[in-house]
Amino acid sequence: MKLAFDDAGRGDCVVLIHGHPFDRTLWAPQLAALRDRFRVIAPDLRGFGRSPVTAHRVTMREYAADIEELLDGLGIGPAAVVGLSMGGLVTMELAAFQPERYWAIALVATTMQPPTPQDRATRLERAAAVERDGMAVLVDYMHTGVYGPACPPSVRARVDAMMDAAPPEGAAAALRGRAERPDYRPLLAGLDIPALVCAGSADPWSDEPVTAEIVASLRRPETVIIDGVGHLPNLEAETEFNAALGAFLRAHAPG
């Protein structure tokens, strides 16, 4: 799978993996902040942005394999991976499959838990609705929790436009893939690399218990909770998020 991607800067490599139903432009502030010190790769996952769409279902392992293929094609060896929401699931797939390849990971607004039977059924129903009725179905759902109470209107407008532009087939395929995600807790219990765990205190999905469970499941966690923001701390609290992520990456970079 040939992914569209941005490639900026020089130095130790950092890969930024967006969530669902977004695209690589979600990371524009971080790419700008990190490119002076790192080589930053920000791909569009399969089915989003300018990457090809695969209909019906794409699993987290398939998204991860696309990233591995991209890094192999670019001749990139050790890298850090930063994933938000579904991108965090893909990050965990990468780290579980090839832990020796990554010098650090960052898990932002995500979960290690497998879906419950009800969650699985809901995602499958929502996938069918998105295919039938378009992205408005998913955007309406995202509005129930994606933004914190003080999210700037400019961020809302930008993210709404990003979600509206997502291909319905790609978004539905991701929903079905997420419905089949594994339990990452045992897969990452022995992971011996630094792991930044970041969430917003007003995120109803990656809430305090979910985030605490991620921290408890890792050997070398570092935790950042950003007060008052929702599911997109990298945009709602750009300055604070960039400072925390940059400090973490600089502290653990091999170069």
Protein language model regions, located:
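Acidic catalytic loop of the alpha/beta-hydrolase fold
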Residues: 201-206
